[in-house]
Amino acid sequence: MSDEIIVVSTPYLPGHKITKTLGFTWGLIVRSRGLGRNITAGLRSLAGGEIHEYTQLLNQSRQEALDRLKEHAATMGANAVIGVSFDSSETGGVMTEVLAYGTAVVVEPETGAASPVRLG
C-alpha cells in the first residue's frame, strides 16, 4: 500500500487538490558503518576523492527512510506526502542517522483546466 503513496518535495501536488491534511510524517533509520567499511573508507580517504562505500550506505539509508516515511503516511490514511525533506547526522562517530519527513495529506485529481504552477 505504501507503494501507492505519492511523494513530492513541493508544498503542493500539481494537478491535484489537497482534501485533507493529516499531519507530520517521517521515516528514520540509524545505520552503523561497520568496522570493515570504516577501514576501507579510511584507506580510500588517504588518496582523496569520493568514498564509494559511504555513498552507497547513504543512498541505501535515504531509500529506507523514504520507504518508512511512506509506510507511516499510509497508516495515517494518506495517499500523498508533500514538502518532503531529508536530514542526516552522525552519531558516535560510527553511526549515521537519516530522517525523511513531510506532511501526510489526502489528495484527489483536479478536474477541468490545468493548475498553474505556483512558485515559492
From Swiss-Prot:
Domain of life: Archaea
Gene3D superfamilies reported in the protein's UniProt record: Hypothetical protein apc22750. Chain B
Transmembrane segments: none
Family according to the record: Belongs to the UPF0145 family.
Protein name: UPF0145 protein Mboo_1021
Organism: Methanoregula boonei (strain DSM 21154 / JCM 14090 / 6A8)
